[in-house]
Amino acid sequence: MVKVGINGFGRIGRLILRAILENYKNKIQVVAINDLGSIETNAHLIKYDSTHGIINEDIQTSKDGFKIGNQEIKVFAEKDPANIPWGKVGADVVLECTGIFLDKSSAEKHIKGGAKKVIISAPGKEVDFTIVQGVNSKELKLSLIHISEPTRHNS
């Protein structure tokens, strides 16, 4: 099972969590989320999505995070990615979804926090690899550390 952390719980971060819960919960475990919004607000936003509807999971909040179904997710509120303790929660991969930390040097701050790899959800600068699904995604090498996958808009 791959353990991931999500930095940024806006639209992209929430959609990634929802996709994992609905399609990959036996393969991917979200162990932590970092976002400056309150735990209660973020729990509400994942439960009730204006486009995708209500998620079919019970969500409970605590002072440290929330529980979705049987899955506990730790929540941090750090502005600096270097201060997020990804290693302590066992996150192998961090999904960078803030739209702020788009270059290699800023993405590397997640590595300082204990993550092994970083995937940037927006077009990155000076990253090891940029994936365009259906164009070069088969060229992805597991040895890469900083990966950028520009967000696709499906209409």
Located regions from the model:
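N-terminal Rossmann-like NAD(P) cofactor-binding subdomain of oxidoreductases
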Residues: 1-148
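A short, hydrophobic C-terminal helix/tail in secreted or cell-surface proteins
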Residues: 147-155
